[in-house]
Amino acid sequence: MGKNKQSESSKRWLKEHFDDKYVIKAKKQGLRSRAVFKLEEIQAKDGLIKPGMTVVDLGAAPGGWSQYAVKQVGDNGHVIACDILSMDPLPGVDFLMGDFREEAVLDALLNKIGGKNVDVVMSDMAPNMTGNDTADQAKSMYLVELSLDMCRQVLKKNGSYTVKVFMGEGFDQFFNEVKNAFKVVKTRKPDSSRARSREVYLVATGFKL
């Protein structure tokens, strides 16, 4: 019975995925994922990424956000990406594969970044979901805390940050933490984010150091 339910749920997800206009649009445009449209909407509203900037992309694979960011920063900019999963090379993107919770990987990433000279930290990280809402929420909040900690280590004064957060336990506390670290914090729900998803994006500007 459980398997049948799971199978029906998987079929529904696959149908929804392949009928999704953003999935179709991403394929037509040669983009790596539909997630790029979320960043594109954030960029249209908030203009976080500018030519010549240095951007760090956490949880980058398969590379949709990095693919978009590298076009925005141009030849004089720099995109540094990190993910536990492998990612096909992208021109202009400096990719490090590994789990930055591990000290050696974190050190290698910080070495690539080279100090507090980052203009934008962005994170579309999400844990592998188990279906246990309490455990999944705790894991997702742990990841967003890690991305905020990365901001504290690498962002320059007045730098910016955008991060995917799932509404639920711990959200309000995290929102307040971000508010304490940045001058302005906004919550965005891009049109390309599925309506039934609890995900939202925090967009924070004016890092206080």
UniProtKB/Swiss-Prot annotation:
Q: Where in the cell is it found?
A: Cytoplasm
The reaction(s) annotated as catalysed by this protein in its Swiss-Prot or TrEMBL entry are: uridine(2552) in 23S rRNA + S-adenosyl-L-methionine = 2'-O-methyluridine(2552) in 23S rRNA + S-adenosyl-L-homocysteine + H(+)
E.C. no: 2.1.1.166
Which keywords belong to this entry?
Answer: Cytoplasm, Methyltransferase, rRNA processing, S-adenosyl-L-methionine, Transferase
Please name the top-level EC class of this enzyme. Answer: transferase
**UniProt similarity note:** Belongs to the class I-like SAM-binding methyltransferase superfamily. RNA methyltransferase RlmE family.
What is this protein called in UniProt? Ribosomal RNA large subunit methyltransferase E
Specify the species: Pseudoalteromonas atlantica (strain T6c / ATCC BAA-1087)
